[in-house]
């Protein structure tokens, strides 16, 4: 329900997955989507407080292997089923926490750190499902999964460029003036994305 409500294209893409793993991908998507919604859209509430509660509930769900929150309960089930490394979850939550206060990414190191936590690790969580415990296959495909995560995230940055800047006062691309986005800057961003896709495929 969450996947279909928030991303029609992703919901359609998951129809190509085997039914045996489709629910687990939905479970991961539901978790990351809820975290993202808290930091990006709950403007009439104390987002910091909501995020802290969400993080605490997530940690308890993983430890106790159950949650009364259906999204977190579904996620912890997939987390344990595929032995998803906890450091992936930690990195994701760190990037989401950055969205609560950080508005500009001045250096490429900051930019890469955010993308790793907000996108690369999500690809790696999904990869855990796809390889179903095959550690050798996971290591073989790890770099490609991360590159695809980076590419799709940068495409999303471009798609949401105007909304992020005007509604959230947030910019992700370092050394880029959104008020004067010249052809050279656009070309650099597009070339970054092409390079990521080349590694991913």
Predicted regions and their residues:
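Acidic catalytic motifs of isoprenoid enzymes
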Residues: 1-201
């Amino acid at each position: 329900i969450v996947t279909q409500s928030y991303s029609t294209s992703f919901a359609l893409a998951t129809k190509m997955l085997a039914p045996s793993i489709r629910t687990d991908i939905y479970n991961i998507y539901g978790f990351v989507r809820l975290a993202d919604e808290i930091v990006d859209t709950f403007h009439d509430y104390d987002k910091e407080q909501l995020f802290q509660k969400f993080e605490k509930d997530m940690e308890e769900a993983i430890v106790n292997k159950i949650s009364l929150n259906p999204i977190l309960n579904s996620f912890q089930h997939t987390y344990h089923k595929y032995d998803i490394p906890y450091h992936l979850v930690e990195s994701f939550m760190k990037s989401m926490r950055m969205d609560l206060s950080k508005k500009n990414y001045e250096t490429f190191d900051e930019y890469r750190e955010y993308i790793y936590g907000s996108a690369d690790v999500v690809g790696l969580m999904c990869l855990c499902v796809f390889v179903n415990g095959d550690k050798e296959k996971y290591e073989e495909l790890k770099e490609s999964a991360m590159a695809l995560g980076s590419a799709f995230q940068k495409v999303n940055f471009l798609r949401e460029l105007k909304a992020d800047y005007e509604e959230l006062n947030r910019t992700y691309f370092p050394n880029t003036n959104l008020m004067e986005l010249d052809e050279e800057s656009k070309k650099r961003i597009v070339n970054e994305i092409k390079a990521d896709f080349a590694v991913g495929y």
